[in-house]
Swiss-Prot record:
Keywords: Aspartyl protease, Cytoplasm, Hydrolase, Nucleus, Protease. This is Protein DDI1 homolog 1. Changing residue 263 to A: In mg572; restores the levels of slo-1 in erg-28 mutant background. It is an enzyme of class 3 (hydrolase). Its main location: cytoplasm. Residues 109-132 are annotated as: Disordered. It comes from the Eukaryota. It comes from Caenorhabditis elegans. Disruption phenotype: Increased sensitivity to low doses of bortezomib which causes proteasome dysfunction. Double knockout with proteasomal subunit pbs-5 or with rpt-5 knockdown results in failed expression of the proteasomal subunit rpt-3. Double knockout with pbs-5 also results in the occasional mis-localization of the transcription factor skn-1a within gut nuclei. GO terms for cellular component: cytoplasm; nucleus. Aspartic protease. Required for the cleavage and activation of transcription factors such as isoform a of the transcription factor skn-1, which in turn regulates the expression of proteasomal subunits such as rpt-3. Plays a key role in the degradation of the potassium channel slo-1, perhaps acting directly, in cleaving slo-1 upstream of the ER-associated degradation pathway (ERAD), and also indirectly, via activation of the transcription factor skn-1, which mediates proteasomal homeostasis. Expressed in most tissues.
Amino acid sequence: MSFQVSVAVNDGPFQKKSVTPNTTIGDLNNDAILIWKDTAIVYDISDESKNFGPTVTLEQLGVTQISMVYIYTTAFPCPSGDLRSIVPAQVRLISQFASAASSIFNGQSSSSAQSAQRTRRVEQDDEGEKSMFSRKLLDSPATFKALSENMFFRLKNEPHKLGYGLPELVERFLAKKDMTYKEFEQMFRSYVEEEVHKEEIIKNNPNSAEAKMFLEAKRNKELIDEQYLHSMTHHPEDMIAVTMLYINLTINGVPVKAFIDSGAQKSIMSMACAERCGLNGLIDRRFQSMARGVGGTEKIEGKIHLCDVKVEDAHFSCPFEVMARREMDLLIGLNVLRKHGCCINLKTSRLEFGNGTTTPFLQSNEIDSHLKEIMALPEEEMQFEDGST
């Protein structure tokens, strides 16, 4: 079965190549001396311990349709003489971008490359410990006790580091974090016995329905891990919380930061914002009702039928439902966006109005400042839809 894979030669641009699992390295490039797959070297002609050559197939190198393949040939300079000193330019750029993005958005001092390396080390450590789960371990009280004590200490102090390779064990532990060591030892023995039982079924009766179920779960986890690593390496921006869309505007001379939400049917103003802008007396309380949405049900205190909103140098008349909620000052919903022919231009990061007025979306630091200072919210309450602060 053929599939397409992304291939870059000597730090050149990626090209899509139609290949099959039996496609050889010689078919791709007969002068290949070093090949990276994603973030690891999988082909090194100088490695005498392995029989590398043009006849090696992509299947032998573990190349799949989501793999990124970097090929280096005899024409690529290697001043150090060590082929393994060659690192793909794309990987270096991704690491630099991820490091900068991590520092800006998450305030982390370490680079994403170091983070990915730590993730791989944790994964390898956890898988190494998991590979120790055997009948021999269960039959050796001293060895089992030493391992269970080590696991108990790590789960008490750094469960997140075990969550990648041993998620089920971490989940069981966190369900009862205050358990004693004796209780943990019993739970850990039960967990190890289950894992050993699965491996024994797969080994002794691979064609059984139970074995096939275990194998499928194992393959799915491997695929998830591969996709996660691929995403961390080639799409690090996906790991950064997206900044929600806010704009600056003015109501009655009072500056307001408005949240742009094209998924909201109506536009909403908080009672605090209405009072701050001197609009409290214009609330028509005959329009009291209940609003139902993803966040639950909230009471609408009334409606402001016509509110003059100034964006840049233009004025727009907007209706607003008024709520007592304080988590959001002002929400511009679809009714106002459609009324004024607005376009959310993510390419230029601006909100464009039908009359030609445009205004930029705010940066994350401006939004944080708004939530803390204007809304007077504690920092721990500043949570966006994805749960990030």
